Amino acid sequence: MIVGLGTDIVEIARIETRISEVVEKELQTNRLAKRVLTPSELDIFIKSSNPGRYLAKRFAAKEAAAKALGTGIGRGVSFQHIEISNNENGAPIVTFSAGAAERLAALGGVKGHLSIADEKHYATATVILES
C-alpha cells in the first residue's frame, strides 16, 4: 500500500550558479552542498564531472522524499536524514535515517521507491513510500 507520495523539480541553473564560482578543490566546502549532501554523497559530488547537475538531482530527490514523508525539510527531517545512492545497475535508492526513518515508521512505511530524471534545464524526482 502507498503511504506517501512526493515530487519535486529543480532548475539546474539555480544550483549551478550557487557552485559556479567555486574551484574544484573547494567544492567540499560549498555551503549548499554541505547542507544537502551526506558525507558519502559529498565525496561523489566532489569527483563529479558535472557537480551542479549532481547536486540538483540530489536536492530534488531529497525534497521529494521529504514531501512523501509529509513534513518537507524541517520538523524533525533534515537533508542529512535522507541519502540517495545507486544500486549495482545504476537505479537510484533512497535511504532514511534519524528523523526521516522515524517519520517513515510512523506512517507505517517500510520502503521508498525513487525515480530521478533530468533534461537540459531541469531535474525532477518522485518518491513513493510503501507499507
Curated annotation (Swiss-Prot):
<keyword id="KW-0276">Fatty acid metabolism</keyword>
<keyword id="KW-0479">Metal-binding</keyword>
<keyword id="KW-0963">Cytoplasm</keyword>
<dbReference type="InterPro" id="IPR037143">
    <property type="entry name" value="4-PPantetheinyl_Trfase_dom_sf"/>
</dbReference>
<comment type="similarity">
    <text>Belongs to the P-Pant transferase superfamily. AcpS family.</text>
</comment>
<comment type="function">
    <text>Transfers the 4'-phosphopantetheine moiety from coenzyme A to a Ser of acyl-carrier-protein.</text>
</comment>
<protein>
    <recommendedName>
        <fullName>Holo-[acyl-carrier-protein] synthase</fullName>
        <ecNumber>2.7.8.7</ecNumber>
    </recommendedName>
</protein>
<keyword id="KW-0443">Lipid metabolism</keyword>
<keyword id="KW-0444">Lipid biosynthesis</keyword>
<dbReference type="InterPro" id="IPR004568">
    <property type="entry name" value="Ppantetheine-prot_Trfase_dom"/>
</dbReference>
<dbReference type="GO" id="GO:0005737">
    <property type="term" value="C:cytoplasm"/>
</dbReference>
<keyword id="KW-0808">Transferase</keyword>
<feature type="binding site">
    <location>
        <position position="8"/>
    </location>
    <ligand>
        <name>Mg(2+)</name>
    </ligand>
</feature>
<keyword id="KW-0275">Fatty acid biosynthesis</keyword>
<dbReference type="Pfam" id="PF01648">
    <property type="entry name" value="ACPS"/>
</dbReference>
<dbReference type="GO" id="GO:0006633">
    <property type="term" value="P:fatty acid biosynthetic process"/>
</dbReference>
<dbReference type="GO" id="GO:0008897">
    <property type="term" value="F:holo-[acyl-carrier-protein] synthase activity"/>
</dbReference>
<feature type="binding site">
    <location>
        <position position="63"/>
    </location>
    <ligand>
        <name>Mg(2+)</name>
    </ligand>
</feature>
<dbReference type="GO" id="GO:0000287">
    <property type="term" value="F:magnesium ion binding"/>
</dbReference>
<dbReference type="InterPro" id="IPR008278">
    <property type="entry name" value="4-PPantetheinyl_Trfase_dom"/>
</dbReference>
<keyword id="KW-0460">Magnesium</keyword>
<dbReference type="InterPro" id="IPR002582">
    <property type="entry name" value="ACPS"/>
</dbReference>
